[in-house]
Amino acid sequence: MSEQQPLPTLPMWRVDHIEPSPEMLALRANGPIHRVRFPSGHEGWWVTGYDEAKAVLSDAAFRPAGMPPAAFTPDSVILGSPGWLVSHEGREHARLRAIVAPAFSDRRVKLLVQQVEAIAAHLFETLAAQPQPADLRRHLSFPLPAMVISALMGVLYEDHAFFAGLSDEVMTHQHESGPRSASRLAWEELRAYIRGKMRDKRQDPDDNLLTDLLAAVDQGKASEEEAVGLAAGMLVAGHESTVAQIEFGLLAMFRHPQQRERLVGDPSLVDKAVEEILRMYPPGAGWDGIMRYPRTDVTIAGEHIPAESKVLVGLPATSFDPHHFDDPEIFDIERQEKPHLAFSYGPHACIGVALARLELKVVFGSIFQRLPALRLAVAPEQLKLRKEIITGGFEQFPVLW
């Protein structure tokens, strides 16, 4: 009798932070769903097929990531926190999402275009004025989304370093391993910050998200605690993911100079370039996906999944599904566009899609014109990935120009 093979273990890190994991590609080639072992030691399933991932993400038979069964509940104050969208589902989730959705609509985001461009231009100038090598993370990828989300929400630019640091701490160890005490404290501090800003907005309302949330409270659409949680969640989500995508996108352009030259030669390709960056390096590219929990026994691609199992939807892995993308391992900014799952899918799809795309288009539409010789100051493998944070990104991103 042959010995049972050990289960593949997650996470499966990229090679030099850029190339897809060979283990992931080999596993993905064997089908769209796989039995795996998670860092916590629990066993479960990893969905790597594009169609199968969409099916899970849109199926009400699965609980969202923020509503795990008791056996898997991590020690985190965020789970179950009022207004934290991933901790709500069904009508409650739809009610809360409808409150913040207008702030991230195409109309509201279009009003921010000039402001985002001005913020980016200022940060490009600040970066260019630094002695070389300089940390692009400190001077561009970290502050830009923080300053943009502060404009959308109606909080002071001067506060961006404060709440960006808190959002960083909140997202630390929100996967399955590691201590969470600092994360809990940061979440409560962030909520206290939001409460104070909401009190200020009572006296000085304006066209921004905090004012919208106060109106929702006054109209009985949300409790004050739900409004605070929604605002805090938007600050975190509106900042963390884009930081990593700017950094991964630049890495991809450095790795593929011909693609960079195409973009510089034809700036109209920026929309396609951003979509290819999103496909290859979706939010959480440093991790393996987002969790779901079936309420009852289900079947995925012929695989029986018992109720309350861990089912990780591998958003980054779905980008390499050859049944959906031609030559998926090739980074090609002129790729024939097909929908990807960078922003998830279904009722819990990312609400800030338009804003994230705008930020990335502004950065990649002008950074190589502003800094034509921009390049890494170290080898890619020397960059230190923030493995403890689910959105990924790097501790520092030293560049020359």
Curated annotation (Swiss-Prot):
Essential cofactor(s): heme
Pfam families xref list: p450 (PF00067)
Keywords in alphabetical order: Heme, Iron, Metal-binding, Monooxygenase, Oxidoreductase
Domain of life: Bacteria
Gene Ontology MF annotations: heme binding; iron ion binding; monooxygenase activity; oxidoreductase activity, acting on paired donors, with incorporation or reduction of molecular oxygen
Keyword Signal recorded: no
Chain segments annotated as coiled-coil in the UniProt record: none
Binding residue positions for heme: C350
EC number(s) on file: 1.14.14.-
Purpose of the protein: Cytochromes P450 are a group of heme-thiolate monooxygenases. They oxidize a variety of structurally unrelated compounds, including steroids, fatty acids, and xenobiotics.
Family classification: Belongs to the cytochrome P450 family.
Protein name: Cytochrome P450 BJ-1
Originating organism: Bradyrhizobium diazoefficiens (strain JCM 10833 / BCRC 13528 / IAM 13628 / NBRC 14792 / USDA 110)
